[in-house]
Amino acid sequence: MSRRTDIESALRRLAPRIPDHEFGAVLDHALDSRGLRQAAPEEAAWLSLVAYVRHVFTDYDGLRDQDFDEDSARFFVAEEIEAVLTGWGVRRRLATED
């Protein structure tokens, strides 16, 4: 199987109810991110999913623009991220480093 197929499968398992247009954006991020090229497909799918939700569905970037450090900004948006992920059928929970 190709890396694309492996990540697609991992993402479908992680987020079975993710809308198709969001699925494509998360998949593209997982495939295009230099930092994820060596990651296992499951890890690439998870990290891309969390990053996508953080930047698209929360005020994370606004908090960073207000000089919140990365950890603080992530803390303040964690519940919003969890809500979106839960809506997409994700059972995995955020870890402190996510």
Model-derived regions: residue spans:
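Structure-specific DNA junction-binding interface
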Residues: 1-98
